[in-house]
Amino acid sequence: MKLLMLMRKFLTGLLLCGAIVSAYGDVWDEVSHGYADNNGVKIHYATTGTGPLVIMIHGFPDFWYSWRHQMEGLSENFQVVAMDQRGYNLSDQPEGKESYNMEYLVSDVAALIRHFGSDKATIVGHDWGGIVSWQFAFARPEMVENLVILNLPHPNGLARELASNSDQQENSAYARRFIAGSATDPDILFGGPMNSQSLSFWVSDPKAREKYVKAFDNSSFDAMLAYYKQNYPRVSEGNTPPPAPQLDVPLLVFHGLRDTALHSNGLNNTWDWNDSDTTIVSAPDANHFVQQDAADLVTTTLKWWLLSRQ
C-alpha cells in the first residue's frame, strides 16, 4: 500500500514524543574521516555511528557538513557516512567537465558503499545529491535499501515542470547561466561573482558559515558548474526526455515549500513512478536546504521511518 502523504500534524506529534529526542547537536569533532577510491579518484567522507549503512550526498553549494543534524540523530542506530562529492572540499577534483558526467557521480556512491564492505545502503540525497541518488537508484537498484530525497523532484516530475511550468522555468534561470557561463564571470552567481563568501550566503549560523567558507576555499568552482553543464536536464515544451525507469524501493521525500529553485508541483505523481511505498513530507516554513531549515522534522522523521523498516 502506498502512503502518499504523512501529515505534518502527525510528525509534530512525533517531535514531541519522549521516545525520540528532538534536538540534535554538532558532530564536527565526533566524526571519523576517510577516503574511498573510485578508479584513482579519492572521495572524502565523514562517518559516525554503528549499524546499517546510510550514505548521505550533498548538493550545491555544500559539503558533508550539511548533514550534521541528521548524523547526530541517526548515529545511535546507524552508521552514517556523509560524502564530499567530487570537486568539493576534501574530495579529488579531476580535470575536465566530462569527469563530472552522471555515470561517474553514480560510481562514486557505489565505490563508497563497497569501501565499507557492504553491497547496499540507504541512500539520502539533497539537491544535486538528490539527482545523483535518483540516478543511482535507477542504475544500481540492487544496491539501494531505502531511498530518501530532499528538495529534488523525481526526474519525470522535474522534466514536466521544466517543460510546462513558467514558475519553474523562471526558477531555473540560474542553472541556464551556469550551463552557459564560467566560474570567473563577474555575475555568474545570482548577479555577482562566485567565491567562497558568496557561495556561503545561505548559511545563517556564523560558526557553520566559517566552516563552509573554508570548505569552498578547498573546492573547485569549475567542478561545481560542470555538474550543471554535463547533467542538468535540457527540456523545453514538446521536448522532454523519455520517462525514467520505474522504481521499486521504499521512498521518503522531503520538500521545503519555500524553495525558490525547485517548485513543489514537481512532486505530483511521484507515487506513480515507484511500486513500493512512497512517503512525502512537506515543510511549509523551510527553504531549499530543508535538512537544516527543518532539522528536527527531517531528522526525527527520517529516524522513525528507517527504524520502522528494520
Language-model region placement:
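Flexible "cap/lid" subdomain of the alpha/beta-hydrolase fold that forms the substrate-access gate
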Residues: 26-31, 41-43, 53, 67, ...
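Bacterial N-terminal signal peptides that target proteins for export
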Residues: 2-11
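Bacterial N-terminal signal peptides
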Residues: 11-19
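Catalytic histidine-centered segment of alpha/beta-hydrolase-like enzymes
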Residues: 286-295, 299
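Conserved HGGG/HGGXW glycine-rich cap/lid loop of the alpha/beta-hydrolase fold
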Residues: 47-90
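Sec/Tat signal peptide C-region and signal peptidase I cleavage site
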Residues: 21-25
